[in-house]
Amino acid sequence: MRECLSIHIGQAGVQIGDACWELYCLEHGIQPDGFILDHQHDNLENPKVEHMNASLDTFFHETRAGKHVPRTLFMDLEPTVIDGIRVGRYHSLFHPEQLVNGKEDAANTYARGRYSVGSEVIELVLERIRKLAEQCSGLQGFLIYRSFGGGTGSGFTSLLMERLSVEYCKKIKLEFSVYPSPRISTAVVEPYNAILTTHSTIEYSDCAFMVDNEALYDICQHKLGIERPSYASINRLIAQVSSSITASLRFEGPLNVDLIEFQTNLVPYPRIHFPITALAPIISAEKAYQEQLSVSDVTASCFEVSNQLVKCDPRLGKYMACCLLYRGDVVPKDVNEAIAAMKSRTSVQFVDWCPTGFKVGINYQPPAVVPGGDLARVQRAVCMLSNTTAIVEAWARLDHKFDLMYAKKAFLHWYITEGMELGEFVEAREDLAALEKDYEEVGLSF
């Protein structure tokens, strides 16, 4: 089998993980206790169930008793959020050893997450990952969920990625990263954390799918009609993206996409590995359309700014690569027509050194939705991952915020007292300036 290990780090990573595994269980017909719903009865009633769970082993380990345990690890430096999972609806789905927490918080600082507090639990976390890896017959790689702005998400992840690169050097590492929003901030020192972690993980991460809270809030408010979106609503949106990206690993389909194929098709140069994500259709459960949207409709929606999960305007940049992952009632002929229509649009510009540009995945398993959730059930959906030079706008925004604080040496003492040096800040900022330049250069014509 080609198994994948999911690692959820910090408050954002853990809460996204909770939403992801809830959705995966619904998609595979797994109950909160880990057992598949009346397996034999289901097979007689619905022969698709057996086919549906043919590739289940990539994400779930089946015990002798027939229980399906997720191949995952949840980790936070303080216990509150992990305790929420220990007593939550899916508490019996996970083995207690898969839920790891420290005793004190990273206090929103990269330095505590990486050095002082993080270093105390890193060996335990690696030991638990080793145990999970030993249950795999052919480990394909790691999916790492975290935020750039938090202390644990930024600091501990950079320490872990470094160690994983040593112990599992050939295994692919894909990230789902919550990027600091332009206007909504959960911590004053987010720009420091984000730039330090980007610098320290850029060589260890193979591909990082970007989402940001502001774009997600806007989708919840404008598309789903939620006046005051909760983190639960936002995390379920991210879970839909994660599910679409991993669907071809978990279900059979006519055009499957392997983990390494994302890297091969989306990353033209090692450092340019930050694709933006978009999802369509996003329809509220209350306003569920009577007519279903066509393949062309959902494909066109993905190229609209309002369907993107990151605040940046792709019309201001050029696409280097684009991966379209379709689910449900979709046939290749419709996809080809939809792509041809998109290529003829002047607003969708590709760099001249990448003329084809589109990678396609098709999976017949329609998207599932959480009962009582915000999203409507649809027959077909598409998730778009696109590597575009427009993301440089997001990096430039972040760099500017970093510069404003660093010019006054504001909040630096929290990092220095944990053993960091000013040189690390300077080095990280220079690396990000180089990253901005890299993006500008790849967008240039010959």
From Swiss-Prot:
Reactions performed catalytically: GTP + H2O = GDP + phosphate + H(+)
A GO molecular function held by the record: hydrolase activity
Keywords for this protein: Cytoplasm, Cytoskeleton, GTP-binding, Hydrolase, Magnesium, Metal-binding, Microtubule, Nucleotide-binding
Pfam family, one: Tubulin_C
Protein name from the UniProt record: Tubulin alpha chain-like 3
Motif (MREC motif): 1-4
Signal sequence interval, chain numbering: none
Enzyme Commission number(s) from the entry: 3.6.5.-
A single BP term in Gene Ontology: microtubule-based process
Protein localization: Cytoplasm, Cytoskeleton
Cofactor(s) named in the record: Mg(2+)
CDD domains: alpha_tubulin (cd02186)
Paired cysteines (S-S): none
Residues forming the catalytic site: E261
PTM info: Some glutamate residues at the C-terminus are polyglycylated, resulting in polyglycine chains on the gamma-carboxyl group. Glycylation is mainly limited to tubulin incorporated into axonemes (cilia and flagella) whereas glutamylation is prevalent in neuronal cells, centrioles, axonemes, and the mitotic spindle. Both modifications can coexist on the same protein on adjacent residues, and lowering polyglycylation levels increases polyglutamylation, and reciprocally. Cilia and flagella glycylation is required for their stability and maintenance. Flagella glycylation controls sperm motility.
Binding site for Mg(2+): E78
GO cellular component: cytoplasm; microtubule
Family: Belongs to the tubulin family.
Role summary: Tubulin is the major constituent of microtubules, a cylinder consisting of laterally associated linear protofilaments composed of alpha- and beta-tubulin heterodimers. Microtubules grow by the addition of GTP-tubulin dimers to the microtubule end, where a stabilizing cap forms. Below the cap, tubulin dimers are in GDP-bound state, owing to GTPase activity of alpha-tubulin.
Binding locations of GTP: Q11, E78, S147, G151, T152, T186, N213, N235
Subunit structure: Dimer of alpha and beta chains. A typical microtubule is a hollow water-filled tube with an outer diameter of 25 nm and an inner diameter of 15 nM. Alpha-beta heterodimers associate head-to-tail to form protofilaments running lengthwise along the microtubule wall with the beta-tubulin subunit facing the microtubule plus end conferring a structural polarity. Microtubules usually have 13 protofilaments but different protofilament numbers can be found in some organisms and specialized cells.
UniProt cross-references to InterPro entries, sorted A to Z: Alpha_tubulin, Tub_FtsZ_C, Tubulin, Tubulin/FtsZ-like_C, Tubulin/FtsZ_2-layer-sand-dom, Tubulin/FtsZ_GTPase_sf, Tubulin_C, Tubulin_CS
UniProt free text on domains: The MREC motif may be critical for tubulin autoregulation.
